[in-house]
Each structure stands twice: as C-alpha cells, then as structure tokens.
C-alpha cells in the first residue's frame, strides 16, 4: 500500500506539471518508454553505485536515439525519482499517471475482462452501463481471459461487477457449500 501511495504522489506531481505545460500526452508517452527501458535494464538502473544524474543522462541519450526528447521539467522529475531511489515504482507511477489523466478529462478508467473480443453492440451496452453508474464516459483497458467462459468483468472506481459465467458458477458453488455447512 505504501508504494502505491508513493507512486500516486509522483504521478500527481508529474501530471500537474504536464497540464501546466500542456504536455500531458507527451509526458505519458515518454514515461511509458522510460518504464520499458527501466524494465529491460533494471539491474543497471537499480545499481546504487551509479548516481541519479548519470541514470537520467543515460535515459536521455536513449530517448534521443529513438528520435524523441524530453524537457528540463521531465528530466528533473526523473532525477528526483532516481535520487530518492523510487525507480522501482516507475511502472506504478505510469499506471497512476494514465488513470489520473483520464480522470482529469472527466472520464473514468475501466478495466474490462472478457472471454472473447466484444462486438460494437456489446461494447455500447457496457459503455451505457458505466455511464449510468459513474455519470462519466469510460476509457476501457481490455484484456481477454477465456477462463471466464462467457460474459464480462467490469472494474471501475474500486468496484467489480462480475457478469461472467465463471463468476456465476463460483457464486452458485459458494451458496451450495454454505447450505451444506448449516
């Protein structure tokens, strides 16, 4: 829990700067590249004998090599992350950043797990449900899980709505077992 609070604070700080500079998309994209780079070279970036500025300079060189760049405020953000040895929470910072950005646009992030690819009509029904429930437009992050058999699991605003066949089977099984115990 502590790391998620830390990640949320860093994400909020970066988003505030990005909004002020009108660079929310750019910062999100660069942060995603930095997270990928960190995950691929984790051993190097977690080496305590290398200073924070050198870590950030290496990231800067890599970003420049792929044809992108970032400004001084983003560089300062990364330097603080590495000075405080918080680089291990970069993936969580990215996730919080994405979600906070969506919320700042008066939308709601929704994690959707389905048994198969949804049709436009099915997606519209789910969109309408989420709008009715949250009073905001959803932004879906979808993943396929065939173990659901059919149906969907919707996660938003800290709540989970399980409308999957696997979820219903679990509920029926639980109720049957509870009756046997009594």
Swiss-Prot record:
Keywords: ATP synthesis, Cell inner membrane, Cell membrane, CF(1), Hydrogen ion transport, Ion transport, Membrane, Transport. It is found in: Cell inner membrane. One of its GO terms (cellular component) is proton-transporting ATP synthase complex. InterPro entries: ATP_synth_OSCP/delta_N_sf (IPR026015), ATPase_OSCP/dsu (IPR000711). Pfam families: OSCP. GO terms for molecular function: proton-transporting ATP synthase activity, rotational mechanism. It comes from the Bacteria. It is a peripheral membrane protein. F(1)F(0) ATP synthase produces ATP from ADP in the presence of a proton or sodium gradient. F-type ATPases consist of two structural domains, F(1) containing the extramembraneous catalytic core and F(0) containing the membrane proton channel, linked together by a central stalk and a peripheral stalk. During catalysis, ATP synthesis in the catalytic domain of F(1) is coupled via a rotary mechanism of the central stalk subunits to proton translocation. This protein is part of the stalk that links CF(0) to CF(1). It either transmits conformational changes from CF(0) to CF(1) or is implicated in proton conduction. Belongs to the ATPase delta chain family. PANTHER family: ATP SYNTHASE DELTA CHAIN. F-type ATPases have 2 components, F(1) - the catalytic core - and F(0) - the membrane proton channel. F(1) has five subunits: alpha(3), beta(3), gamma(1), delta(1), epsilon(1). F(0) has three main subunits: a(1), b(2) and c(10-14). The alpha and beta chains form an alternating ring which encloses part of the gamma chain. F(1) is attached to F(0) by a central stalk formed by the gamma and epsilon chains, while a peripheral stalk is formed by the delta and b chains. This is ATP synthase subunit delta. It comes from Pseudothermotoga lettingae (strain ATCC BAA-301 / DSM 14385 / NBRC 107922 / TMO). The gene is atpH.
């Amino acid at each position: 829990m502590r790391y998620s609070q830390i990640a949320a604070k860093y994400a909020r700080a970066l988003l505030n700067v990005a909004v002020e500079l009108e660079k929310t998309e750019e910062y999100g994209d660069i942060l995603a590249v930095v997270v990928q780079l960190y995950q691929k070279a984790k051993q190097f970036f977690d080496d305590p004998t290398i200073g924070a500025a050198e870590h950030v300079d290496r990231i800067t060189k890599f970003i420049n090599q792929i044809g992108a760049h970032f400004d001084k405020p983003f560089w300062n953000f990364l330097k603080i992350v590495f000075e405080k040895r918080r680089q291990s929470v970069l993936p969580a910072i990215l996730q919080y950043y994405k979600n906070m950005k969506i919320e700042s646009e008066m939308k709601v992030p929704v994690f959707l797990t389905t048994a198969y690819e949804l049709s436009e009509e099915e997606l519209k029904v789910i969109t309408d449900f989420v709008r009715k429930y949250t009073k905001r437009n959803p932004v879906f992050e979808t993943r396929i899980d065939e173990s659901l058999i059919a149906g969907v699991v919707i996660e938003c605003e800290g709540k989970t709505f399980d409308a999957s066949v696997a979820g219903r089977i679990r509920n029926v099984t639980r109720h049957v077992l509870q009756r046997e115990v009594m």
